[in-house]
């Protein structure tokens, strides 16, 4: 399906440079003299790169066949991560290269959003907050009760997170996967 510039709106998924993009800004400009045009800002779905284009009346933009599906992460086998559909129990595999930075937030039995383009997975989005166990923390030699600040901790997925000094190995914490930051301790 092709869209003309009057049909473009924020959130629409389209093809630009043979890659899937989402429109994040669409501004219609009507100069005092001459034809109106649209200044459109696109964000590449896979990498997050921003593309800005000026479109004139008559320009057509191709729609992208993008589907976002909630799937449960089941297990890993070498470079493949396997996800299962909750309704049909169908399993799909996602290669390590597609996971990208999400790999450090992969916890079995959690629900992830898998983005498909023409029935091929292109992106895995972890839940915003996840619970993780602290495996190892840096030893602090100062008096912890008077110290303020953070130390580094390795969590069960292998990710490194800055945590407050009072957090010890073996504790559960809540982490924001989008920023990679510590949110709270879970008791």
UniProtKB/Swiss-Prot annotation:
<dbReference type="InterPro" id="IPR012340">
    <property type="entry name" value="NA-bd_OB-fold"/>
</dbReference>
<comment type="function">
    <text>Involved in peptide bond synthesis. Alleviates ribosome stalling that occurs when 3 or more consecutive Pro residues or the sequence PPG is present in a protein, possibly by augmenting the peptidyl transferase activity of the ribosome. Modification of Lys-33 is required for alleviation.</text>
</comment>
<dbReference type="InterPro" id="IPR020599">
    <property type="entry name" value="Transl_elong_fac_P/YeiP"/>
</dbReference>
<dbReference type="Pfam" id="PF01132">
    <property type="entry name" value="EFP"/>
</dbReference>
<dbReference type="InterPro" id="IPR015365">
    <property type="entry name" value="Elong-fact-P_C"/>
</dbReference>
<keyword id="KW-0963">Cytoplasm</keyword>
<keyword id="KW-0648">Protein biosynthesis</keyword>
<dbReference type="InterPro" id="IPR013852">
    <property type="entry name" value="Transl_elong_P/YeiP_CS"/>
</dbReference>
<dbReference type="InterPro" id="IPR001059">
    <property type="entry name" value="Transl_elong_P/YeiP_cen"/>
</dbReference>
<comment type="similarity">
    <text>Belongs to the elongation factor P family.</text>
</comment>
<keyword id="KW-0251">Elongation factor</keyword>
<protein>
    <recommendedName>
        <fullName>Elongation factor P</fullName>
    </recommendedName>
</protein>
<comment type="pathway">
    <text>Protein biosynthesis; polypeptide chain elongation.</text>
</comment>
<keyword id="KW-0379">Hydroxylation</keyword>
<dbReference type="GO" id="GO:0005829">
    <property type="term" value="C:cytosol"/>
</dbReference>
<dbReference type="GO" id="GO:0043043">
    <property type="term" value="P:peptide biosynthetic process"/>
</dbReference>
<dbReference type="Pfam" id="PF09285">
    <property type="entry name" value="Elong-fact-P_C"/>
</dbReference>
<dbReference type="InterPro" id="IPR014722">
    <property type="entry name" value="Rib_uL2_dom2"/>
</dbReference>
<feature type="modified residue" description="N6-(3,6-diaminohexanoyl)-5-hydroxylysine">
    <location>
        <position position="33"/>
    </location>
</feature>
<dbReference type="GO" id="GO:0003746">
    <property type="term" value="F:translation elongation factor activity"/>
</dbReference>
<dbReference type="InterPro" id="IPR013185">
    <property type="entry name" value="Transl_elong_KOW-like"/>
</dbReference>
<dbReference type="InterPro" id="IPR008991">
    <property type="entry name" value="Translation_prot_SH3-like_sf"/>
</dbReference>
<dbReference type="Pfam" id="PF08207">
    <property type="entry name" value="EFP_N"/>
</dbReference>
<dbReference type="InterPro" id="IPR011768">
    <property type="entry name" value="Transl_elongation_fac_P"/>
</dbReference>
């Amino acid at each position: 399906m092709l869209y003309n510039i009057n049909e473009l709106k924020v959130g629409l998924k389209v093809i630009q440079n043979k890659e899937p993009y989402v429109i994040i800004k669409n501004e219609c400009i009507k100069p005092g003299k001459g034809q109106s045009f649209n200044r459109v800002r696109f964000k590449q779905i896979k990498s997050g790169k921003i593309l800005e284009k000026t479109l004139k009346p008559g320009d057509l933009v191709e729609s992208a066949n993008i589907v976002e599906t909630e799937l449960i992460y089941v297990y890993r086998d070498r470079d493949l991560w396997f996800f299962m559909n909750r309704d049909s129990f169908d399993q799909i595999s996602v290669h390590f290269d597609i996971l990208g930075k999400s790999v450090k937030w992969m916890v079995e039995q959690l629900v992830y959003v898998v983005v498909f383009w023409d029935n091929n997975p292109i992106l895995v989005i972890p839940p915003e907050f996840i619970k993780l166990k602290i495996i190892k923390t840096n030893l602090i030699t100062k008096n912890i009760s008077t110290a303020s600040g953070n130390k580094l901790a390795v969590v069960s997925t292998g990710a490194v997170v800055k945590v407050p000094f009072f957090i010890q190995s073996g504790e559960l914490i809540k982490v924001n996967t989008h920023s990679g930051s510590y949110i709270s301790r879970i008791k």
